[in-house]
Regions:
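Adenosine-phosphate binding glycine-rich loop
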Residues: 178, 302-402
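N-terminal ligand-binding/catalytic initiation module
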Residues: 14-173, 395, 401
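General beta-strand structural signal in soluble alpha/beta enzymes
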Residues: 125, 151-154, 175-178, 209, ...
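Solvent-exposed alpha-helices and their adjacent loops that cap or buttress functional pockets
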Residues: 32, 75-80, 116-117, 142-144, ...
Length: 402
């Protein structure tokens, strides 16, 4: 593989012998041709006066009156039963950062495409021109009656934590921040299978999570819920402890349940004797020496994109047994698309009012279970994004808990 760096990490080209494509250039060209990736398609004929009178006035008044008497009828008489909102403020879009609502729209449209193509769920992207927490909460609450679920997307930490928590308290429909929980669910699914491959037990594993933003916090919380007792979080300054400086309120909360040994030092110090590394941080920050200092048959999920914390071949050379990344050109891709479409499909079909921790665990177990025991190996711990079983399997796991 040849890596060509133009200076912009999102313009890097990963060229294999059998496939040479400049994804940035080709995607820009296609977006110009598409002029938007989604559109409204009507489900009813309007070919004569009777059709018009049934779809609109005067006939439409009757379903309006029925919904007025019982708002739950909105799920039966409108598209609300299978419609979610994808909402962002453009403050943390991919690895591009704070690029604003207009520039975030291609990603939000793409997310809507994934909802539909992988889960059969209709999604409407909304990009808000505010980064004020209260304004975002108010905006979502005011528009929520039109939707069956809310997917928060690309909102920077720590505001995303408060926004999600408050919306869950205020609304009686599922609210889900995919950057947090979708990532955490797929990571846990991969780790569940990686433990089988390595023969390690969760009770004995020391876990290091590098990156203390939205994804890192959510991954840590879900791993704790699953039963990993020994987790250390790190950020750009090294190991996070109760004595760390410049932590936000959520990171301070996490010091109460992680790094119980009160260790200090660098990421390299944290990795000594660790069994599992989960990186949602920055490229090339883990060396072969650091991997070699981990326990035998280490598990690494290096998910910085487009360049991971360490390249899989280097990690394997240093002794790692299982390596996952966020990229499709390496084995064990950690891809949220195996989680969120099925989660929303199940939540909407089951008319859930929230997505619980038990549902997240069930989704992770369902995803892990899609890889048969006889096919499980260090290069095959997660199902492919295009596996047609994924959404229905995850959906069933969610509905079974409603």
């Amino acid at each position: 593989m040849v890596i060509i760096n133009s200076g912009n990490p999102f313009e890097m080209k990963y060229i294999k012998e059998e496939k040479k494509m400049d994804y940035a250039k080709e995607s820009l060209r296609l977006h110009g041709d598409w002029k938007g990736k989604i559109e409204v398609v009507t489900r009813v004929p309007v070919e004569n006066k009777d059709d018009l009178s049934l779809a609109y006035t005067p006939g439409v008044a009757q379903p309006c009156l029925e919904i007025q008497k019982d708002i739950n009828k909105s799920y039966e008489l409108t598209r609300r039963w299978n419609m979610c909102l994808v909402v962002t403020d453009g403050s943390a879009v991919l690895g591009l950062g704070d690029i604003g609502p207009e520039a975030g729209m291609p990603v939000m449209e793409g997310k809507a495409v994934l909802f539909k193509e992988f889960g059969g769920v209709n999604a409407v992207p909304i990009c808000l021109d505010t980064q004020d927490t209260e304004e975002i909460i108010k905006s979502v609450v005011n528009i929520a009656p039109a939707f069956g679920g809310i997917n928060l997307e690309d909102i920077s930490a720590p505001r995303c934590f408060e926004i999600e928590t408050r919306l869950k308290e205020l609304l009686n429909i599922p609210v889900f921040h995919d950057d947090q929980h979708g990532t955490a669910i797929v990571v846990l699914a991969g780790i569940i299978n990686a433990l089988k491959v390595t023969g390690k037990k969760k009770e004995d594993c020391r876990v290091v999570v590098n990156g203390a933003g939205s994804a890192g916090v959510a991954i840590t919380k879900l791993l704790l819920t699953y039963g990993f007792p020994h987790i250390t979080m790190c950020d750009i300054n090294g190991i996070i402890s109760k004595n760390s400086l410049n932590l936000n309120w959520m990171q301070q909360q996490m010091t109460e349940v992680t790094n119980l040994e009160e260790r200090t030092g660098t990421l390299a110090d944290a990795l000594k004797g660790a069994d599992i590394f989960v990186g949602v941080s920055a490229p090339n920050i883990v060396s072969k020496e650091m991997v070699a200092s981990m326990n035998k048959d280490a598990i690494l999920f290096a998910m910085a994109n487009p360049v991971p914390e360490i390249m899989p071949d280097l990690a394997k050379e240093a002794g790692a047994k299982v390596v996952g990344t966020g990229r499709s050109d390496f084995p064990n891709q950690v891809n949220n698309v195996v989680a969120f479409p099925g989660i929303f499909k199940g939540a909407l079909e089951g008319r859930a009012t929230q997505i619980t921790e038990e549902m997240k665990l069930a989704a992770a177990n369902a995803i892990a279970g899609l890889v048969p025991e006889e096919e499980l190996n260090e290069n095959n711990i997660l199902p492919e994004a295009f596996d047609p079983r994924v959404a229905d399997t995850v959906s069933k796991a969610i509905k079974d808990l409603i």
